[in-house]
Structure formats: structure tokens, C-alpha cells
Amino acid sequence: MAEGNKGVGPILRMSDDIDGIIQAIRDDNPDKEIRVIDRHAYVRIEGDPPLLLTRASIENELGRDYPLREIELLMSSFNGVMDSSNSDQFIWTRKNI
């Protein structure tokens, strides 16, 4: 992550799917450093914008269908601006897309 640059990304409540979601974010952003801050009850996941998360990557990691609305139920908050207009992906950035 760039020095002095606050990352963007989801803040998720702890669940059985967290490890798969984290790996899916890493898979979707292979050239970015992904920082994970575990606060026991929740996990903050962040990287330099834009940060992408696709349904295909989550399904690949978890081995099952995974509608993105399930992420919305886990997401207590997020850093940055989140574009959820596509049912197959989320993008976090600093500006409106």
C-alpha cells in the first residue's frame, strides 16, 4: 500500500467464509498488497484503490454459489466509495465511479 495512502475495502463481521473472502480479494487484485487487520469480532480488509472483489473468485475459493448480497450482510462498513451496481462484483475506490 502506498505510503501515507489510506486503503479502501470492506470491514466484515467474522464468519466461516472470511478466509475465502480474503483470498478472493487477493486473487482479484494480484498486483496489490492486501492488508488484513483482525479485530476478533470483525476483519478490516484494505488495499490501494481501486480494489475489486468478484463473485467468481469467492465461489472459486468457497466451492459453492455465493450471491454478493451475502457479503452485504457481513459488511458492517467499508473504507472509500463502494460500487455495487454490478451483481457480479464490488469495487472500492476513493471517488464515485
Per-region residue spans from a language model:
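A short linear hydrophobic-aromatic micro-motif
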Residues: D31-V36
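Helix-rich interaction surfaces within compact, conserved domain-sized segments
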Residues: R39-Y42, E46-I97
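Conserved N-terminal glycine/acidic-rich loop preference
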Residues: M1-I22, D28, A41-E61
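Short, solvent-exposed secondary-structure boundary motifs
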Residues: I21-N29, R69-M75
